[in-house]
Design a protein with these regions (language model features):
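Protease-associated
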Residues: 42, 49, 53-128, 137-141
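Residue patterns forming the tRNA-binding/recognition surfaces of aminoacyl-tRNA synthetases
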Residues: 1-38, 51, 99-103, 109-111, ...
C-alpha cells in the first residue's frame, strides 16, 4: 500500500481561517493498488467521518482525524500538530467538502474532485481513498453518483495503453514499482509498505482480477 499527497487547489474557508496555507495544502490518500492511479478522478471521504489538517514535514495534510496517530506512527513524523482554533481541532464531516478539487500527481496531472461514499472506512489508511471509477465496483458506483470522469488506460490484455506513454505495454504488476518510484522522485510519496490483504482472483486461471 502507499500513502500519497495530492495537491489541493482550494480548501474550505474554516481551515483557511485556522491558518492552513493553501500553497502547502494536500489531501493524503491511501491505496493498495498503485497501478490504478493513472485512472484517478476523485478522492472519496466517509460522509460521517471527521477530517482535519495535520501540519508535518512543512506540509498541511488533510485526512481522517481518527487516523492521525496511526498515520503519524507509520510515516515516522517526529513532530506534527492538528490544526486548531482556540485549542480545539478544526474538523469537518466528509460530506461537507463541496467543490474541493486537487491535482493528481501521476502523469497528466488531472484535476480530481473530493467526493464521499459509504464504502469509506477507517479500518486502514487515511480515510481519504483514491478513487478510479474505471476500476472496481465501489469506485464506479460513487463515481457515477457524483458524475466524475472514468479513465481506462488498460487494454484487453491487461497492459497499459499509450494514454500513459511512460508505462505503455507494461502489465499492472510491472507498472506498480515504476509508479511508486515516479511518486517518490516527485516528493509526493509519504510511505510505501507491504501489507497482506484479500483480492479477487479468477476461479479458473487463479490470476488476480483486473476490473475495467
Amino acid at each position: 500500500s502507499i500513502y500519497v499527497n495530492f495537491k489541493l487547489n482550494n480548501i474550505p474557508a474554516v481551515f483557511a481561517e485556522a491558518g492552513v496555507d493553501l500553497e502547502r495544502a494536500y489531501v493524503l490518500i491511501w491505496t493498495t493498488t498503485p497501478w490504478t492511479l493513472p485512472s484517478n478522478t476523485a478522492v472519496s471521504l466517509g460522509p460521517d467521518i471527521d477530517y482535519c489538517f495535520v501540519e508535518a514535514d512543512g506540509k498541511f495534510m488533510m485526512f481522517a482525524k481518527d487516523m492521525v496517530e496511526a498515520v503519524a506512527k507509520v510515516a515516522g513524523w517526529e513532530s506534527y500538530r492538528i490544526v486548531e482554533t482556540n485549542g480545539e481541532p478544526v474538523t469537518m464531516k466528509g460530506d461537507q467538502f463541496g467543490d474541493i478539487t486537487y491535482i493528481c500527481p501521476v502523469l497528466h496531472e488531472n484535476t480530481g474532485r473530493i467526493i464521499w461514499g459509504e464504502h469509506v472506512t477507517l479500518d486502514a489508511g487515511t480515510g481519504a481513498v483514491h478513487t478510479a471509477p474505471g476500476h472496481g465496483v465501489d469506485d464506479y458506483k460513487v463515481g457515477m453518483k457524483f458524475g466524475v470522469d472514468t479513465i481506462m488506460p488498460i487494454d484487453d490484455d491487461g497492459r497499459f495503453t499509450d494514454y500513459v506513454p511512460q508505462w505503455a505495454g507494461l502489465t499492472t504488476d510491472e507498472a506498480n514499482p515504476k509508479i511508486i518510484e515516479w511518486l517518490r522522485e516527485r516528493g509526493t510519496l509519504i510511505l510505501h509498505e507491504d501489507i497482506n490483504h484479500s483480492y479477487p482472483h479468477c476461479w479458473r486461471c487463479k490470476q488476480p482480477v483486473i476490473f475495467r
